[in-house]
Amino acid sequence: MTDYLLLFVGTVLVNNFVLVKFLGLCPFMGVSKKLETAMGMGLATTFVMTLASICAWLIDTWILIPLDLVYLRTLSFILVIAVVVQFTEMVVRKTSPALYRLLGIFLPLITTNCAVLGVALLNINLGHHFLQSALYGFSAAVGFSLVMVLFAAIRERLAVADVPAPFRGNAIALITAGLMSLAFMGFSGLVKL
């Protein structure tokens, strides 16, 4: 049980996919201008990342390894992610049309989010079993969502703040992301994996 807690805390805070591994920066910068959009994208990414992580582990363990097709791992994981994203898009469209309109083009772009593919590939490289794989995918998604919501809240405050002209827009956003990354470095001694 302690191993699972350490895996969760380590993935969310210490080895955050956005601030430490620099994966998923496109939606991190693109969807974080409004808090509602960031929360919706975080929820959608959490669902996709967790489900894609589980499906990728199952496909790798039950199909690719027994048939000696491990060279198709990346391609098959991309296909799995695309199917999961399409499923998520259909669910969001039916359950929350307003969120579907807010997310716009970013929902299909989860397919190309390198963090989702990175989680699936890292699960295999780290040798996780099924529960660890599911927890790792969920933890990475929670860390992604946490950072995205925090960043969106900060960007909303910066939008109404008196920022010097050269720093307005993406410049202050990148500085803020760097400061967030430094803040998350404070967790580096918390968990040793």
Swiss-Prot record:
InterPro entries: Ion_transpt_RnfA/RsxA, NqrDE/RnfAE, NqrDE/RnfAE_oxidrdctase. It comes from the Bacteria. Its EC number is 7.-.-.-. It is found in: Cell inner membrane. One of its GO terms (cellular component) is plasma membrane. It is a multi-pass membrane protein. GO terms for biological process: electron transport chain. Pfam families: Rnf-Nqr (PF02508). The chain crosses the membrane at residues 5-25, 47-67, 72-92, 102-122, 134-154, 171-191. Its main location: membrane. Keywords: Cell inner membrane, Cell membrane, Electron transport, Membrane, Translocase, Transmembrane, Transmembrane helix, Transport. The complex is composed of six subunits: RsxA, RsxB, RsxC, RsxD, RsxE and RsxG. Belongs to the NqrDE/RnfAE family. NCBIfam families: PRK05151.1, rnfA. Part of a membrane-bound complex that couples electron transfer with translocation of ions across the membrane. Required to maintain the reduced state of SoxR. This is Ion-translocating oxidoreductase complex subunit A. The lineage of its organism: Bacteria, Pseudomonadati, Pseudomonadota, Gammaproteobacteria, Enterobacterales.
